[in-house]
């Protein structure tokens, strides 16, 4: 079985800390079941780090493809991040881009194409060549069926299609496994959720140094504790440190993206890979982070 790079690095960082305090035995990360993942996701007091895989295992398979999702499940990941777009005939498909140009062998705007038209083309790998697996762009329903009872899902752009997404998650029985996020006003999110009996999980995204986000942050902090906050920062400064402290003191979990430097103050996956992974990820964890989105599964 493939080993999960970030999980191993976090385990190593934890071991380094433990060794400085008391003798400890190193153990490799184990694959989680959905009950364990959800328990950790909803527990702000646990130190267990939830690992989120950005667009699945896109280094080995086409991004946002079923094999890319299956791969991170086999690795023992806790959550997979996938992106959605809406076709001309109102089918939610997995794609980060609004066009099919980069990720498939075809060209065109997704919102101007039917699902059947998109299915004429094949997914490309990260190298820009057609996948030898002859993969087609999957629907959200197909992807969530694969994830059911196996892994949680962060659905990028999920709020934009909230009602359609919820219809699918309720049909499949995976609503409690799906997390969406955004920088929407508190009142808007509350009004949307009041329309439904069951709701998707929601997480505010805050950039502490963004002046427009400061009142938004205060509004969310004034409410009951959020499941988590995604905090974005291009450097670690007093403003960021204060925001992190307030998130943790509020009883919420802290989510940090290590995808590229401007999201995590230079503590990115590539820096970790090229220098000291245990040290870089260790700094992220020492901040109080218990959810990390990575590009290095």
For the regions a language model picked out, list residue spans one by one.
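Phosphate-group recognition and catalysis centered on beta-loop-alpha active-site segments
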Residues: 19-297
């Amino acid at each position: 079985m493939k080993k999960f790079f970030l999980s191993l690095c976090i385990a190593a960082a934890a071991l380094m800390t433990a060794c400085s305090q008391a003798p400890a035995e190193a153990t490799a990360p184990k694959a989680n079941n959905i009950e364990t993942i959800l328990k950790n996701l909803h527990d702000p007091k646990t130190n267990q780090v939830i690992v989120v895989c950005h667009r699945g295992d896109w280094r080995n398979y086409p991004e946002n493809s079923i094999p890319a999702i299956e791969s991170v499940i086999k690795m023992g990941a806790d959550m997979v991040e996938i992106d959605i777009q809406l076709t001309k005939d109102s089918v939610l498909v997995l794609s980060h881009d609004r066009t099919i140009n980069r990720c498939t062998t075809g060209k065109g705007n997704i919102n101007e194409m039917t699902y059947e038209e998109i299915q004429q083309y094949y997914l490309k790998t990260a190298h820009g060549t057609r996948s030898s697996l002859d993969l087609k762009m999957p629907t959200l329903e197909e992807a969530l069926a694969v994830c059911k009872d196996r892994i949680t899902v962060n659905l990028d752009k999920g709020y934009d299609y909230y009602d359609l997404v919820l219809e699918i998650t309720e049909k499949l029985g995976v609503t409690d496994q799906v997390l969406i996020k955004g920088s929407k006003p508190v009142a808007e999110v509350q009004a949307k959720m009041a329309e439904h009996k069951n709701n998707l999980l929601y997480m505010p995204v805050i950039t502490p140094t963004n002046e427009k986000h400061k009142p938004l942050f205060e509004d969310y902090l004034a409410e009951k504790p959020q499941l988590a906050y995604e905090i974005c920062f291009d450097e670690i400064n007093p403003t960021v440190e204060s925001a992190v402290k307030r998130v943790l003191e509020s009883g919420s979990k802290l989510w940090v993206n290590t995808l590229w430097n401007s999201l995590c103050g230079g503590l990115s996956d590539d820096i970790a890979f090229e220098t000291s992974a245990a040290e870089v990820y260790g700094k992220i964890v020492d901040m109080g982070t218990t959810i990390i989105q990575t590009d290095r599964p």
